[in-house]
A protein has these predicted regions:
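Short, well-ordered alpha-helical segments enriched in acidic and aromatic residues
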Residues: 16-31
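Solvent-exposed, amphipathic alpha-helical segments
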Residues: 5-13
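A short gly/proline-enriched turn/hairpin at secondary-structure junctions
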Residues: 31-41
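Short beta-edge strand/loop motif at the mouth of beta-sheet-based domains
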Residues: 39-49
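A beta-strand edge to alpha-helix "cap/lid" segment located at domain peripheries
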Residues: 2, 33, 48-118
Length: 118
């Protein structure tokens, strides 16, 4: 699987809230850092628990990809998220190692949600 396919599969798993698929695409020493919320988890199990909590608190969370940039060992994905009747924009930066996501850095405007676009 190339980097584009990896991230497309990963994003699809987020929209399906499929923790098993998400976890299978993480490196064992994955770091998940949401810079906007100042939340950080490290290691496969801690990151899985963190994402499970996100899904628990946002059962209607959905992402749409606005653009996806890929290289040999990284990806950057611009997205719009929607949950609880509001939308916000952000970008994820993914260093890739040995075909797995080694890190997910999230930068978003979640502190400035807006009404959904129709």
């Amino acid at each position: 699987m190339n980097v584009r396919e990896l991230i497309e599969r990963y994003n699809g798993a987020w929209n399906a809230q499929d923790l098993d698929t998400i976890a299978s695409l993480h490196a064992p020493d994955i770091v998940f850092h949401n810079h906007t919320a100042d939340e950080r988890a490290q290691g496969a199990e801690a990151v899985r628990e963190h994402i499970a909590e996100i899904f628990k608190n946002n059962p209607d969370l959905q992402f749409s990809t606005r653009s996806l940039y890929v290289g040999d060992d990284f990806a950057a994905c611009e997205w719009t998220a929607r949950a609880h009747g509001v939308e916000w924009d952000g970008v994820d930066v993914f260093p890739i190692r040995d075909g797995l996501i080694a890190r997910k850095d999230v930068y978003s405007a979640s502190h400035r949600p807006r009404a959904p676009r129709d």
